[in-house]
C-alpha cells in the first residue's frame, strides 16, 4: 500500500521555529545577531506598512494577539531586554524582573494605541541597544543574569533569544499578510 502523504501543518505560533539557540557564540555569530537586532525596526515598519486599522486589529492566528498588540508587545519586550543587558553588563549576576506579557498585551494602550508610537520606541531602543552591544567585550557575553522563571542566562543567550524574538514576531505579521493577501 502506498504511504499516505500528510500535509505539513505550519505552527502559526512559531513561524521561524522555536528558540533553541544558546551560546557561547563566536564574535562572527554575535556580529550577525547584532546586525539582525539593528535591522528589526525597519523589518517591523515594513511588516505593517500600508495596513489599515481593521487589518492591524486582526489576530495573527486564531487565539493570538492582533498585529497591533504584537507591535506593542515587541516594544515592551525589547525595552525590558535592553534593561536586562545593561544590568547584566554592570552588575554581578543580577536577578531580572519578569513581567506578565499576556496581561500587558490586554491593557487598553496595547489594544488601541497607534502602532507608530511603539515603532518609534522600537527605533530608539534598538539604536541604543546596538550601540551598547557593539561595545560589549567578548568575555562579557559570558556574564549571566538570573530570571526567576527561566533560570540563569548568559548575555550570549539573551542576545540569541531577543534576536530570534524580533524575527519571530515580524514573521507573525508577514505570514498573516501573505495568508490574507494583504
What are these regions (language model features)?
Residues 30, 35-41, 45-47, 103-142, ...:
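Acidic/histidine-rich alpha-helical segments that form the ligand environment
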Residues 11-36:
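Secretory/endomembrane lumenal or extracellular ectodomains immediately following the signal peptide
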Residues 37-65:
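A glycine-rich, hydrophobic loop/mini-helix early in the fold
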Residues 1-20, 57-103, 127-131, 138, ...:
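Short, contiguous alpha-helical
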Residues 22-29, 107-114, 150-154:
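Short amphipathic alpha-helical segments at helix-loop
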Residues 28-32, 69, 83, 113-117, ...:
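Positions in alpha-helical segments
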Residues 27, 43, 52-54, 80, ...:
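Detector for Asparagine
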Amino acid at each position: 500500500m502506498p504511504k499516505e502523504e500528510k500535509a505539513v501543518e505550519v505552527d502559526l505560533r512559531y513561524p521561524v521555529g522555536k528558540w533553541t539557540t544558546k551560546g557561547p557564540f563566536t564574535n562572527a555569530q554575535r556580529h550577525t545577531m547584532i546586525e539582525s537586532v539593528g535591522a528589526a525596526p525597519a523589518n517591523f515598519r515594513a511588516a505593517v506598512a500600508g495596513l489599515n486599522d481593521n487589518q492591524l486589529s486582526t489576530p495573527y492566528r486564531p487565539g493570538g494577539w492582533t498585529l497591533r498588540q504584537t507591535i506593542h508587545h515587541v516594544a515592551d519586550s525589547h525595552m525590558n531586554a535592553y534593561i536586562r543587558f545593561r544590568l547584566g553588563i554592570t552588575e554581578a549576576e543580577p536577578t531580572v524582573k519578569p513581567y506578565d506579557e499576556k496581561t500587558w498585551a490586554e491593557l487598553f494602550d496595547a489594544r488601541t494605541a497607534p502602532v507608530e508610537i511603539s515603532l518609534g520606541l522600537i527605533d530608539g531602543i534598538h539604536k541604543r541597544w546596538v550601540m551598547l552591544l557593539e561595545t560589549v567585550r567578548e568575555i562579557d557575553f559570558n556574564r549571566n543574569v538570573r530570571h526567576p522563571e527561566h533560570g540563569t542566562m548568559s548575555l550570549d543567550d539573551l542576545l540569541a533569544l531577543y534576536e530570534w524574538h524580533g524575527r519571530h514576531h515580524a514573521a507573525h505579521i508577514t505570514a498573516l499578510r501573505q495568508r490574507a493577501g494583504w
